[in-house]
Amino acid sequence: MTATDPVANLQTLIRCPSVTPAEGGALSALDAMLAPLGFTVDKVKASEAGTADIENLYARLGKDGPHLMFAGHTDVVPVGDEADWTHPPFAAEISKGELFGRGAVDMKGGIACFIAAVARHIEKNGPPKGSISFLITGDEEGPAINGTIKLLRWAAERGERWDACLVGEPTNPDRLGDMIKIGRRGSLSGKITVHGVQGHAAYPHLADNPVRGMLQLTQALMDPPFDGGTDDFQPSNLEVTTVDVGNPATNVIPAKASASFNIRFNDSWTAETLRAEILRRLDAAAGDGRLRPGREPVKYDIVWADRPSHVFLTRNNALIASLSSAVEGVIGRSPKLSTTGGTSDARFIKDYCPVVEFGLVGQTMHMVDERVAVSDLETLTAIYETFIAHWFANAGA
């Protein structure tokens, strides 16, 4: 096998059953691809009490700047019922021009293509005038506690510094070249508990149904909208994701009700200002007696998730221009610069260097029969190879 072939690279990676938190042999496979190209490869185990140990990988080619990082993850989500798959999820079979397997799109395909692009660049031009590194985690689809955030810290403590980063997530909605992610909205989660008084459903005057209070509070969180969006970001949106009373009986008024929520927020807010606005809405709704005539204000408490994700926007013109021109040069159209969608590990990388995201088409990620067109693997490799040349030319200018 030669590392210049993205299809062979991807088949090797898919055949490693690396469902989070299992490494499945994927990092060893990467080591075998990168070391012959001249990369120095380190495997880094990260641990934290109450979580699974995670194997990560950091590889670097070159010692000088400018320094370009490629970041990604080899862990994948569970396959579900294997009987539902047309082709076995870890067999990496090709059928009718498509390569099937868990991780084909998200995101072993992006890693396979960038390795092939680096190998082709070296084959044609020799090592780049600077450094290229791979920062690969096995904990992106999981809690993301022992993955990219700790690997970045480990590398930085050893003197690693980066000038730019490309994350190979599947950013394209419909066709390869549709979209480059240049930022992400923030994410904040919390859990509200409303306290009532348990009682018999036939004697509501002797109880206090917390569901009524919860309706008031959740409605206040979702309406009115938090904002109308900004020049770079879509409107912030809050969604109630769970509601629970822990009560299997139909004739008992529950003692408490809980609801979890998540808000994806734009650059109109910080996590701190958003918490303040949410508490303002909850306090106002708790004192509104229209749904609870004659009752005291709703008694509630709120617990915030430990680690909010902060909104960010990359404005590094050289990085964005190098990638945009590579896409346009290979496929003939300009990609949209976007901040839509969920979060990714770019939220950690932005604290170290400018970061953008570009990879395959994401239509089948996490689905049964996840697959990628073989032609897209070749095209993405060509885009990545062109990007590498453009970025080093611009960074060294």
From Swiss-Prot:
Pathway assignment reads:
Amino-acid biosynthesis; L-lysine biosynthesis via DAP pathway; LL-2,6-diaminopimelate from (S)-tetrahydrodipicolinate (succinylase route): step 3/3
Q: Name one GO biological process term.
A: L-arginine biosynthetic process
What does the note accompanying the cofactor annotation read? Binds 2 Zn(2+) or Co(2+) ions per subunit.
Q: Please list the GO terms describing molecular function.
A: acetylornithine deacetylase activity; cobalt ion binding; succinyl-diaminopimelate desuccinylase activity; zinc ion binding
Stored Pfam families: M20_dimer, Peptidase_M20
Q: What is its EC number?
A: 3.5.1.18
What this protein is called in its record is Succinyl-diaminopimelate desuccinylase
Q: Species name for this entry?
A: Rhizobium leguminosarum bv. trifolii (strain WSM2304)
Corresponding gene?
Answer: dapE
